[in-house]
Amino acid sequence: MKLKNLISLILLFSSLSAFSQAAIPQLLKNIPINVVAPASGADSKTLSDLKSIKTLNLNMPAKCFSKGDLPFLASTDEIRFNCLKDALYNESSNIVWSLRGGYGSARLIPDLLKLSKPNKKKFFIGYSDITALHLFLSQEWGWKTIHGTNVAGLLKPEQDQGNVIKLAEILQGKVKQAVINNLAALNNVAKPTELVSGKLTGGNLTMVLSSIGTRWQIKTAGKILFLEDINVAPYQLDRALIQLKQAGLLENIKAIIFGTFDKDSKLTMLVLRNFANDLKVPVFKTDRCGHEKINDPIIYNTDSKIISNGEKFKLIMDL
């Protein structure tokens, strides 16, 4: 009995911790949010737990989360596309928030390319596989989109609470700029840098590579390129970066910012530094954006600048 009671208490405190974190964004209370699942889905408990968060007004139609034939997708391509389209065109909501990443967003882009741009711009949030949609929305529709924690992340107590708080401040207009502090210079070109300005693009490295040769291929010229990834061995990371370079996607860029890559092992950092030293543009590193505990919001397709802040640097993104 004692062991059972202990297990029950552990489960209870774990649940309370998750919901305590989910309840943090009081700034978002009663604001309509359309939740979409353009990639992988979630189990029924996760969906139920999200719906029970009282501080958030989440619109999560059951039809959008019905499983299809492929278990790694939230639903069929048709259902996922229609639910995403409904959310993007919904006049009563200003926020479209992705359930999670995983896989599947790129499968929807051929149909998205057939749509006319909505009259109303929205906040679109997500990361990882959702990078494909960031590229589409920013390049085709000219939207500013937010690389930030997915909705399912609200239930993960291991994630930093600031991930959600900073998102809430942006969505409610409480701040005029999003800031990433303590960027480190990775090459000698970056060290004397006083100012780099340009719009941000990029996201998950695997998805950026997937865009090459498609109608939604990433456009990097004149921009600051942000890249992050997970489950990539150092040699795979090196190969991916070489592919970007040989594809001509690093020509005429303003700078590169690397986010996290699998806890940034010594060999991973060696790969990044070695690659950076072969480039003639400033390259920076941050541990505040990616698949780790901290995932601060990054705003794509907005006027941004990297400025010197002593020995470190700061990324400032206008809203």
Language-model-detected regions and their locations in the chain:
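Short Gly/Thr/Asp-enriched flexible loops that form oxyanion-binding sites at enzyme active sites
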Residues: 101-119, 135-137, 268-270
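N-terminal signal peptide c-region/cleavage motif recognized by signal peptidases
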Residues: 15-17
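ATP/NTP phosphate-donor binding region
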Residues: 20-92
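ATP/nucleoside-binding phosphotransfer catalytic cores, i.e., glycine-rich phosphate-binding loops
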Residues: 260-319
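Short, acidic/small-residue loops that bind anionic groups at enzyme active sites
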Residues: 114-136, 144-150, 281-284
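Internal helical hairpin/lid segments
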Residues: 216-268
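Sec-dependent signal peptide recognition
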Residues: 2-9
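Conserved anion/nucleotide-ligand pocket segment
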Residues: 143-207, 213
